[in-house]
UniProtKB/Swiss-Prot annotation:
Pathway: Porphyrin-containing compound metabolism; protoheme biosynthesis. One of its GO terms (cellular component) is cytoplasm. Belongs to the ferrochelatase family. Fe-coproporphyrin III binds at residues 52, 116. Its EC number is 4.99.1.9. CDD domains: Ferrochelatase_C (cd00419), Ferrochelatase_N (cd03411). This is Coproporphyrin III ferrochelatase. It comes from Mycolicibacterium paratuberculosis (strain ATCC BAA-968 / K-10) (Mycobacterium paratuberculosis). The gene is cpfC. InterPro entries: Ferrochelatase, Ferrochelatase_AS, Ferrochelatase_C, Ferrochelatase_N. Keywords: Cytoplasm, Heme biosynthesis, Iron, Lyase, Metal-binding, Porphyrin biosynthesis.
Length: 336
C-alpha cells in the first residue's frame, strides 16, 4: 500500500487561558457534564498557565517523524486547533491522495480507537470531493519500541528511589460497561498485557495495575482500583517508595502532569512515601521510529512487529476512511 503523506491525529489541548473553557466544552459536548465540573477541571489547566503540554509535544514529535521517514507530515486534532477537519481540507487542496494516520493512543476502545475512526470519517465528509483516503494505523501497545521506551523510563525512575520500590502502572479509567462491550474487556486486557510485557522487560517480577482520572456520576462503575486508593493502601501496608508508570499515556497529558505529578505526588509526600514518575514517550526519536515502522508494515506488507508474552491480547487492524476496524471490536463498541 502506497502513501503520499502522514497525518498525526491527536486529542488537542488549549494553548492559553482564554482557550481552556471552550476546549473543555468541545471535549464534553453532549455528555451532560455540569458547568461546575468544567470549572474544576479548568483549574488544572490554569495551574499551567492555561497551556496543555500536548500540542507542543506533538509538534516536536512531528519533526522527529519527518526525520524518520520520507513522507510529509500533517497535524490534526479532535478537540482543538488545528482541527482535523481543517487539516484534511488542506491535504485535499495539496493533492494528497492517501495518507497513513498515526494516532497518539496505543489502544483499542471507544475513546482510544473508535472515536479517532469517527474523526477520520467526519473529516473526510467535511472535505468532500477529492478528500484523501485515510488509513488509520493499528494500535501499538505490543510494539517492541513501545515496550522498550516504557521499560527504559522505569529504569530511569528507579534510580531516583530506593531499591525495592513498588512498581505501579496506571492508565485512564473508563466505564466498566464500555470496557465490557469490547471482546470483552479488550481495553483493560490490552493495558494489563502491555504492563506485563514492560515489567518483564524492566526486570520486575511483580507489579500493580491501577486506573486514574475517572469522571462522571458516582453511580456509574468505572475500572478500579483507583490510583489514589491504591497508593493509600500501599502506604498503610508499609510501602515507602513507588515507581508510577503512566503506561496508558504516550505523552504528558494534563492527566499526567496534574493528576500524577501534582495530586498523587502530594498524596505520597503526605503519607511519607517517595514517588518517582516514569516518563512517557513524548517526542522521543524512538516514538517516531515506532510510527514509521507501523507505516512500513502497510507499505511493505510486513508482518506486524510485536512483543509476545503469555496470554496475548488481540488488537484492531488498520481502518480505512472511517470504516470499523478489524477484528470488529471497534464496530461492537460503536453499535453496542
Amino acid at each position: 500500500m502506497d502513501f503520499d503523506a502522514v497525518l498525526l491525529l491527536s486529542f488537542g489541548g488549549p494553548e492559553g487561558p482564554e482557550q481552556v473553557r471552550p476546549f473543555l466544552e468541545n471535549v464534553t459536548r453532549g455528555r451532560g457534564v455540569p458547568p461546575e465540573r468544567l470549572d474544576h477541571v479548568a483549574e488544572h489547566y490554569l495551574h499551567f498557565g492555561g497551556v496543555s503540554p500536548i500540542n507542543g509535544i506533538n509538534r516536536a514529535l512531528i519533526e522527529q517523524l519527518r526525520a524518520a521517514q520520507d513522507l510529509p507530515v500533517y497535524f490534526g486534532n479532535r478537540n482543538w486547533e488545528p482541527y482535523v477537519e481543517d487539516t484534511v481540507k488542506v491535504m485535499r487542496d495539496n493533492g494528497i491522495r492517501r495518507a497513513a494516520v498515526f494516532t497518539t493512543s496505543a489502544w483499542s476502545g471507544y475513546s482510544s480507537c473508535t472515536q479517532y475512526v469517527e474523526d477520520i470519517a467526519r473529516a473526510r465528509t467535511a472535505a468532500g470531493t477529492g478528500a484523501p483516503e485515510l488509513v488509520k494505523l493499528r494500535p501499538y501497545f505490543d510494539h517492541p519500541l513501545f515496550v522498550e521506551m516504557f521499560a527504559g523510563a522505569i529504569a530511569d525512575a528507579a534510580a531516583k528511589v530506593p531499591a525495592g520500590a513498588r512498581l505501579v502502572f496506571t492508565a485512564h479509567s473508563v466505564p466498566v460497561a464500555a470496557d465490557e462491550r469490547l471482546g470483552p474487556r479488550l481495553y483493560s486486557r490490552q493495558v494489563a498485557y502491555a504492563a506485563r510485557l514492560v515489567a518483564a522487560a524492566a526486570g520486575y517480577a511483580e507489579h500493580d495495575l491501577v486506573w486514574q482520572s475517572r469522571s462522571g456520576p458516582p453511580q456509574v462503575r468505572w475500572l478500579e482500583p483507583d490510583v489514589a486508593d491504591h497508593l493509600r493502601a500501599l502506604a498503610e501496608s508499609g510501602t515507602r517508595a513507588v515507581i508510577v508508570c503512566p503506561i496508558g499515556f504516550v505523552a504528558d497529558h494534563i492527566e499526567v502532569v496534574w493528576d500524577l505529578d501534582e495530586e498523587l505526588r502530594a498524596q505520597a509526600e503526605s503519607a511519607g512515601m517517595l514517588m518517582a514518575r516514569a516518563s512517557t514517550p513524548n517526542a522521543q526519536p524512538r516514538f517516531a521510529r515506532l510510527a514509521a515502522d507501523l507505516i512500513d508494515e502497510l507499505r511493505c506488507g510486513r508482518t506486524p512487529a510485536r512483543v509476545t508474552g503469555p496470554d496475548p491480547v488481540p488488537g484492531c487492524l488498520a481502518s480505512v476512511n472511517g470504516a470499523p476496524c478489524r477484528p470488529p471490536h471497534c464496530a461492537a463498541q460503536a453499535t453496542g
